[in-house]
């Protein structure tokens, strides 16, 4: 009995630790929305005044938006659509398109790519608006500090991005406790004000929201573009599911995050009922004056943590796109010996910081930035619902009636929010769309370019089986040792092999043709790692399989080979690779400008030797000229 109690107690402690960690990563963005969401719903250009009716209507919209979008759609439905525990829009697209014919599969993966592009557009806006809205609390403390808001915001973000290469393994342990304190403060400030003015609780009645939508449809439609700010960051619940698990994310939401957010929004509404002038900054004005500065510090820490979650999420999404073949190889550094998900991509880091600095200098304030916020978020939400409908039909075997009953209303909500945000396009909504469009162009160009290169390489090469038969019938001069030839195709001879024979006229006594393939599953077991084929005396073919969440490793490949009695020692093996020198031409395939972009990306991509961590002194690289 005592042992069972101890086991149960240990399990409870472990679950609480994971839930606390999830607070620091998953809910950072969503948890900092109270800094600006309600304030922006009454922004002057929307035409809505903080009258009692207006306040009750907006708070009612906030309540039901959170309940429908977060609690029902994401927490109860979307989190069920996992792929071996992993989530995220690319994962959802992969799950929806699995075992489909080529054309529908390509369409669903394109939806996933659009979602990735929108996520990247959102990733530029989120750190900017979050930290800026927190530091703007200085103006509440004293207006004289207003000129320091932008410099302090930029300094905080430069320090944050500059420290990324150290990783978050150490300081990350503080994220959970800080966010726990943050949500506790949100709840306490809101609850105190609700007690002072409990009339705000009437906003739970959906009739306030519905009456507002029906009686003032024009203003209500435009206002929805600001209301959606209360659910920005919701996609992180799904994207980070692989790190913390569905249970911890659901537990954190139901037990702490949802109550704290609702209490704070209702508290801000109660404050506005009592003092409409507090619309200037209802979040900070919830607190007594003596608490303003400590609250500013805590809010800044919370927004830094929210920004870190977005940065880490961007690294993860970009790595996934690289492995799936939608982006060129680039340097991926692991910042933790224990957590495979903690990575650092230098190029992504500095591009993201550059975009954020430009955005902050351009828009100057969180209110101006709010106009740019929303389109990317709602677009991603709508795409998630579309892909979820496919998963519900194909994987969960839902009937059309059930999908129409549950998913269609959710899609209507998403599309309505997206349409409302398009009204902000000229005021700044174009910015995340521009970033998303650039990301989509880059990803589709790289994917198409690699397909063209592979077609041309296969066309210019020889069939592998015929080549091996010919080498055995007419063997060239053999030298001792093992040679590994990296190949993009399992059907043809690698060009590095053909060039080696042409120029050196020798063949190693043991030749391994190695092809690395990324599967549309997040993780593969060790038993699924390789397919080993003995092609004939001295010739082997190894096809190594990795999931799109894994990092291809030569060491692991050769460990799997050893299990199949093919022992390879890295230090005694020569690796032969072909390097394509690409030339843009007028041949059919891609537009000339896309060919130019692809050639530039190919030239600046990380070499296979560096990506696969092959010792440089064991590599022979042979060039091949290809016309696109």
Swiss-Prot record:
Pfam families from the UniProt entry: K_trans (PF02705), K_trans_C (PF22776)
Major subcellular location class: membrane
Catalytic activity: K(+)(in) + H(+)(in) = K(+)(out) + H(+)(out)
Record-linked InterPro entries: K+_transporter (IPR003855), K_trans_C (IPR053952), K_trans_N (IPR053951), Kup (IPR023051)
Cell compartments where the protein resides: Cell inner membrane
Transmembrane regions listed in the UniProt entry: 18-38, 58-78, 106-126, 141-161, 175-195, 219-239, 253-273, 285-305, 343-363, 371-391, 401-421, 425-445
Keywords: Cell inner membrane, Cell membrane, Ion transport, Membrane, Potassium, Potassium transport, Symport, Transmembrane, Transmembrane helix, Transport
Molecular functions per Gene Ontology: potassium ion transmembrane transporter activity; symporter activity
Cellular component terms (Gene Ontology): plasma membrane
Membrane topology: Multi-pass membrane protein
Function: Transport of potassium into the cell. Likely operates as a K(+):H(+) symporter.
Protein family: Belongs to the HAK/KUP transporter (TC 2.A.72) family.
Protein name: Probable potassium transport system protein Kup 1
Gene name, Swiss-Prot/TrEMBL: kup1
């Amino acid at each position: 009995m005592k042992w069972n109690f101890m086991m149960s107690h240990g399990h409870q402690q472990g679950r609480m630790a994971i839930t606390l960690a999830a607070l620091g990563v998953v809910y950072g963005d969503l948890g900092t929305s109270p800094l600006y969401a309600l304030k922006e719903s009454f922004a002057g250009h929307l035409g809505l005044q903080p009258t009692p009716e207006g306040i009750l209507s907006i708070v009612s919209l906030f309540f039901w938006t959170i309940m429908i979008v977060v609690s029902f759609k994401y927490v109860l439905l979307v989190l069920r659509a996992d792929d071996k525990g992993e989530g995220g829009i690319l994962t959802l697209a992969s799950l929806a398109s699995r075992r489909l014919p080529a054309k529908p599969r390509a369409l669903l993966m394109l939806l996933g790519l659009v979602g990735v592009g929108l996520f990247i557009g959102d990733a530029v806006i989120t750190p900017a608006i979050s930290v800026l809205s927190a530091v703007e609390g200085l103006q509440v403390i004293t207006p004289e500090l207003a000129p320091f808001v932008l410099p302090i915001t930029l300094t905080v973000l430069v320090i944050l991005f500059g420290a990324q290469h150290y990783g978050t393994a150490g300081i990350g342990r503080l994220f959970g406790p800080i966010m726990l304190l943050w949500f506790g403060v949100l709840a306490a400030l809101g609850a105190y004000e609700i007690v002072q003015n409990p009339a705000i609780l009437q906003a739970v009645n959906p009739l306030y929201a519905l009456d507002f939508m029906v009686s003032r449809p024009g203003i209500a439609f435009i206002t929805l573009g600001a209301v959606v700010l209360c659910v920005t960051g919701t996609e992180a619940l799904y994207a980070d599911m692989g790190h913390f698990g569905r249970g911890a994310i659901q537990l954190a939401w139901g037990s702490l995050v949802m109550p704290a957010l609702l209490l704070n929004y209702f508290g801000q509404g109660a404050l506005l009922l009592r003092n409409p002038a507090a619309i200037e900054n209802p979040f900070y004005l919830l607190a007594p004056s003596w608490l303003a500065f400590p609250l500013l510090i805590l809010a800044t820490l919370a927004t830094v943590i929210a920004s870190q979650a977005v940065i880490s999420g961007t690294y993860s999404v970009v790595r996934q796109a690289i492995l799936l073949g939608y982006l060129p190889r680039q340097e991926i550094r692991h910042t933790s010996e224990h957590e495979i998900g903690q990575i650092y991509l230098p190029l992504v880091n500095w591009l993201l910081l550059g975009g954020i600095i430009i955005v902050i200098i351009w828009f100057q304030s969180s209110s101006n930035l709010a106009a740019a916020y929303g389109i990317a978020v709602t677009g991603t939400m709508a795409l998630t619902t579309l892909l979820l409908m496919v998963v519900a039909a194909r994987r969960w075997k839902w009937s059309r009636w059930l999908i129409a009953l549950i998913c269609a209303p959710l899609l209507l909500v998403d599309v309505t929010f997206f349409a409302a945000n398009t009204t902000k396009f000229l005021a700044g909504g174009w910015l995340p769309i521009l970033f998303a469009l650039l990301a989509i162009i880059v990803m589709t160009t790289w994917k198409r370019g690699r397909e063209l290169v592979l077609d041309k390489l296969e066309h210019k090469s020889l069939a592998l089986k015929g080549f091996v038969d010919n080498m055995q019938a007419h063997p060239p001069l053999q030298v001792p040792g093992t040679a590994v030839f990296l190949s993009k195709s399992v059907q043809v001879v690698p060009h590095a092999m053909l060039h080696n024979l042409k120029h050196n006229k020798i063949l190693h006594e043991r030749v391994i043709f190695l092809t690395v393939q990324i599967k549309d599953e997040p993780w593969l077991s060790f038993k699924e790692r390789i397919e080993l084929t003995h092609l004939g005396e001295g010739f082997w073919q190894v096809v190594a399989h990795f999931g799109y969440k894994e990092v291809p490793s030569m060491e692991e490949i050769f460990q799997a080979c050893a299990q199949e009695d093919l022992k390879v020692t890295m230090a005694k093996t020569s690796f032969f690779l072909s390097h394509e020198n690409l030339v843009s031409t007028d041949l059919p395939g891609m537009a000339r400008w896309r060919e130019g972009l692809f050639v530039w990306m190919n030239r600046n991509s990380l070499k296979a030797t560096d990506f696969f961590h092959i010792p440089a002194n064991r590599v022979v690289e042979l060039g091949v000229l290809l016309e696109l």
